[in-house]
Amino acid sequence: QRDCYDELVQKKIREPDHFDWQKQARFYWMHDDERAQICVADVPFWYCNEYLGVKERLVITPLTDRCYVTLSQALGMSLGGAPAGPAGTGKTESVKDLAKGIGRQCVVFNCSDQLDYKMMGKLFSGV
């Protein structure tokens, strides 16, 4: 977060509608609804209160920043996203960290050639 503020100060961002400010995850308490709202770019999310434990957050790089904005836009349109890239570059961790930031559960499973429809059924039913 400190790096985010340093970047905003360095770029002399003063307007609340500037994209460099809008792309940051912003948390608001909505008094009328008595719950928290998170906004990323122009997409609002209700905080889902999913307890995820106390863990370290991911280090934010320009690439993870773009990933969050892109995935947030997709979620805002009721779509999904599938980050692509070489192994070990943080694709899964970026998705999990975004889910943690908005308080939603993120289930990760690996699709292999042994994954059949019975196992998928168990996964979707929560077994």
Question: What does each model-found stretch correspond to?
Answer:
Residues 57-60, 106-117:
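Flexible beta-alpha connector loops of hexameric P-loop NTPases
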Residues 115-127:
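Conserved alpha-helical scaffold flanking the Walker A/P-loop in AAA+ ATPase domains
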Residues 30, 77, 119-120:
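Detector for methionine-enriched segments
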Residues 61, 65-72, 78, 117:
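Active-site-proximal segments of catalytic enzyme domains
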Residues 1-62, 66:
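Extended, charged/polar low-complexity intrinsically disordered regions
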Residues 64, 88-91, 113, 117:
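Active-site-proximal structural scaffolding
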Residues 17-23, 42-47, 70, 75-79, ...:
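Short charge-dense sequence patches
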Residues 73-110, 123-126:
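Walker A/P-loop
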